[in-house]
Amino acid sequence: MSENAKFADYVQNNIRGIGEDTAFLGMSNVWVREAIAHNYAQNFTWLGRPVIQVPQDVYAIQELIWACRPDLVIETGIAHGGSLILTASMLAMLDYCDAVEAGVVLDPKASRRKVVGVDIDIRPHNRAGIEAHPLAHKISTIQGSSVAPEVFEQVKAHAMGYDRIMVFLDSNHTHEHVLAELELYAPLTSKGSYCVVWDTGVEDLPDHMCADRPWGKGNNPRTAVREYERLLAGEGLTAADGERLMFEKDKTIEHKIVITASIDGFLRRI
């Protein structure tokens, strides 16, 4: 066994141990709850734009994009645009590495790799910040409800011709909305890639932390994921590529980062 393989095996053993340590996972969930009380995830930027993510989830995004090498990422929920910039920067890094390996000169604006962001309200100052960013050429934005038919038709038009698609769902966190998003967007996910449902951790929050929101315990992204799993197992669904649509929860990435907003939210298409 090579040294690289030995280290990879060592890491997998670490992750398995974490997954079996319910006390450690429980403490991490308490930490996340306390961090939310301090608006911790709102304190970070990515290449100059606010990114509303805990840093460990940013690591997860990096690992997933590097492993899956998507040519299109679809994101619902834009906010300040930091997540779009994060994704665009990772796609640009894939372009760079491809050019280095091929020994060719890179034209940054010639790549087909793109990220499409959807939000019901792209505020003017956020749109201006996104459009002024050097990575704006890799980003397309659509304003409107992510589950509106006319909006989803635009997303599908963007997705035409792409065969390695990744999906991030991070807009309205009610059960009804997230389930509708899953029914529309999850089938666009390419086999071997991911549909990540953010903020499933709402299910673990005390009621007072969601009192000013239309979502909360029993009505959130995790309950939507559970319902979608029942639909997949029951009636069976078809992916956009015409094949049977099946997902599995990737607990390995979750146990690797431990601190995450998305317990049971990393869905890998199989």
Where do the model's predicted regions map?
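N-terminal auxiliary segments of SAM/dcSAM-dependent transferases
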Residues: 1-28
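Residues that form generic nucleotide/phosphate-binding pockets
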Residues: 10, 14, 30, 34, ...
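Alpha-helical interaction segments
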Residues: 20-22, 34-37, 50-52, 152, ...
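Short, compositionally biased "basic patch" segments
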Residues: 23-37, 121-126
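Class I SAM-dependent methyltransferase Rossmann-like catalytic core
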Residues: 29, 33-68
